[in-house]
């Protein structure tokens, strides 16, 4: 018996969570990632590296959310960001245990070698983000650690071939 209709029905009932993710690149062409370590939520025991970013607020565009997240997570003010360079759609579990369909847009933002300013972090971010790190392209290409999105090197090669080469 084929139960594919059950999967389709379940996906049709799932909330779509729109979010903007930022590939933040410094003057040395390193990419900033945060390490998320979950201890007291539905993702307890999971640890991974991920980009700056987060969900859209009511009425926001992906671009507006990208600028807001850049300010909230790094203290960097931008009035706009360039067009997104990648789109991702996938199922994911949130720390609340809700399973959603994630609809992400990835943007590239260049900043000076500024330190991460955590003054605007939410309480949740303070709990789950254990550290930040600037990664070289080669480090990202060769790491065995869990990194989301897992295709950052390919996105960089496709978007900025004059800087990032395989």
Cite the ranges covered by each PLM segment.
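N-terminal strand-loop-strand
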Residues: 2-50
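Charged phosphate-binding loop/patch that engages nucleotide di/tri-phosphates or the phosphate backbone
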Residues: 142-166
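A short acidic, glycine-rich active-site loop
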Residues: 53
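A generic membrane alpha-helix/interface feature
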Residues: 39, 91-95, 154-156
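Unchanged
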Residues: 56-80, 89-147
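Generic "edge-of-domain/loop-turn" microfeature
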Residues: 29-30, 41, 114-116, 139-142, ...
């Amino acid at each position: 018996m084929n139960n594919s209709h059950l999967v389709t029905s379940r996906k049709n009932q799932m909330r779509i969570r729109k979010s903007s993710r930022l590939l933040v690149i410094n003057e040395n062409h390193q990419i900033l990632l945060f390490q998320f370590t979950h201890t007291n939520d539905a993702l307890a025991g999971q640890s991974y590296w991920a980009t700056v970013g987060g969900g859209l607020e009511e009425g926001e565009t992906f671009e507006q959310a990208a600028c807001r997240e850049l300010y909230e997570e790094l203290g960097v003010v931008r009035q706009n960001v360039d067009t997104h360079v990648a789109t991702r759609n996938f199922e994911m579990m949130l720390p609340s245990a809700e399973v959603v369909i994630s609809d992400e847009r990835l943007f590239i933002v260049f900043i000076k070698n500024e330190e991460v300013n955590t003054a605007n972090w939410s309480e949740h971010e303070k709990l789950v983000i254990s550290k930040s790190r600037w990664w070289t392209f080669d480090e990202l290409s060769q790491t065995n650690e869990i990194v989301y999105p897992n295709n950052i090197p390919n996105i960089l090669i496709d978007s900025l071939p004059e800087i990032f080469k395989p």
